[in-house]
Amino acid sequence: MEIEWGFAAALIGALSTFSVWVYLSRRRLYVRTAEIEKALELRTTELESARLQLQRLSTEDPLTAVANHEQFLEFLEREWRRARRDGLPLSLIFVDVDHFRAFNRQFGRKAGDEVLKQVGRCLATVVGRPGDLVARYHRDEFALVLASTDGPGSFKIAEQVRSAIRDLNLPAAKEAPQDFVTASVATSTAVPQRESAWEELDLIKAARHALREARAAGGNRVLRANLGLVGPPELVVTRR
């Protein structure tokens, strides 16, 4: 009888020990699982952050932090198709910093880069609607895409852009006619036809044509393009 009780006690003790071992094993497994899940969550967050960073770098100009040239073209094509579908106007504004080469020669490239950064921030402040885009088009040239904006509306915004850049009060090069950095600004507008492809109406060519005319006239002015490029750009505005 004593042997049976002893065996039972030993068995109970073994079962208790086994239960404790199972509990501790499960506890360790639970803790380890929680650690793995937390590590996976952190890794997923890091990967998503890296993906967003890569996406931003692929669409953003590294100097000015506005959209780059490729993103501008993609955005313009997308907005062109939307405007064609909805029968709405679409406008472009091109901006060129006046006498920028002379500025770089006098003050150095680092100072020139700082001017471009400030101009980029200025443009982003003036054009703040979610459906619009500010991009660096080429060197000292910027481009703005204005969705659902007609000719008079884009011209008004273009004048705001010209004035805002002048009001930055950035010192100009000695050979520039102005004391402060100014910009030549040009606009073009179209209402895409339903039967047309986006390439058929070259808003870029029209706006850049007007931009060349604005530069040739001395800068610090806004011109609105003739979309057919017949005759000179119209609505010249000059501020001296």
Feature-to-residue mapping (PLM):
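Alpha-helical transmembrane segments and their helix-membrane boundary motifs
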Residues: 1-30
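Amphipathic, heptad-repeat alpha-helical coiled-coil "signal-transmission/dimerization" linkers
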Residues: 26, 30-33, 37-40, 44, ...
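Conserved nucleotide-binding and Mg2+-coordinating catalytic segments in signaling enzymes
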Residues: 55-74, 95-108, 117
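Short regulatory alpha-helical coupling segments
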Residues: 55-56, 69-89, 120-128, 147
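Cell-envelope/extracellular polymer assembly enzymes that use nucleotide-activated donors
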Residues: 91, 184
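Short catalytic/binding micro-motifs of nucleotide second-messenger systems
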Residues: 125-131, 163-177, 211-213
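A short pre-motif secondary-structure segment
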Residues: 133-136
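Catalytic-core segments of nucleotide cyclases and related cyclic-nucleotide turnover enzymes
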Residues: 147, 151-162, 176, 190-240
